[in-house]
Amino acid sequence: MNFFSKVVVVLISVVIVYGVLTLGLSELGSEVVTLVRPEVDGSNKNIRVWIVDADNKSWIEHGDSESYWIKQLSNDSELLIIREGEEKKYLAFADRDSHDLYHNLRREKYGFSDKMLDILAFGAISKENCEGIPVRLEKI
């Protein structure tokens, strides 16, 4: 095997290991729920997300101010979350003021996985760099 082939094999291996680590840490870190996210065309898409809880409320974060589904949230928006195998309806509110709270709760709950994913994402998901908008969920 020549030098170029070895470099290609190493690069492909690094990409595969990176992908497996990212997926493994996000799925196996702790509780993962399924957000049934509304799409522009009226359909729904199932998205796996982390969820945190405090004071009888829950928060998820998946999307920024340009995300269609975030823009659609209003005072009476309902979201469907599949949690512990059960579909549960929540009132959903874009909650920019809870950004730091969400990240602190996420670090508490997901610990090592949260730290490692932050490293693998080169700091893009850290509290300081994240542009995501937390969504507060209140049980109906």
What label would you give each PLM region?
Residues M1-N2:
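N-terminal Lys/Arg-rich, disordered targeting/topogenic segments
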Residues L25, W50, I125-K127:
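Short secondary-structure boundary/capping segments
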